[in-house]
Amino acid sequence: RKGFNIDITEEDKKALAEGTVDYIGFSYYMTNVVDSTVTKDVSKSTDGSSEHSVKNPYIKESDWGWAIDPEGLRFVLNELYDRYQKPLFIVENGLGAVDELITDEHGNKTVNDDYRINYLNDHLVQVAEAIEDGVELMGYTTWGCIDLVSASTAELRKRYGFIYVDRNDDGTGTLERYKKKSFDWYKEVIATNGGSLKK
């Protein structure tokens, strides 16, 4: 960093090299595009590259303006694996959306969240492509299995889970839980080890 000069000896470098990780875990939700005025001096930046983000006109966005870019995940997987030659683990990936609780033809409450199914399907297809590219991937987990308060916006209406929780931003709701359509879809993806994905 600017103004700091740390002397690192060869012995220090050896100790650091011996302390390498066994794998790299990371979260992936979106890609970002920045304009040409991005700050080169990080010490003058207030929000990293986000302060210069621009919309990518070639891809869709979520209700919260997050780019939906499955191919970006494949790119990131290949880039990280090529750079570090360590197994990778996707610890978070998912779509925050406004879900509508409905009653189906059998009288069961549910959410027809085809948008979430499409998002996850398309990202998992790209994960499979990255594995075919030679990326060593240890695992994949979605964010999250049940609706909860969004860490990025502090909202309950931004829902990620396979299970709907009847709770609203204003605190109303019964806290009852209902399986969304994506619940059984993802259960099938797991049972078939990805064989049920649509390419």
Regions from the language model: what does each represent?
Residues 1-199:
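Non-catalytic scaffold segments within catalytic domains of secreted glycoside hydrolases
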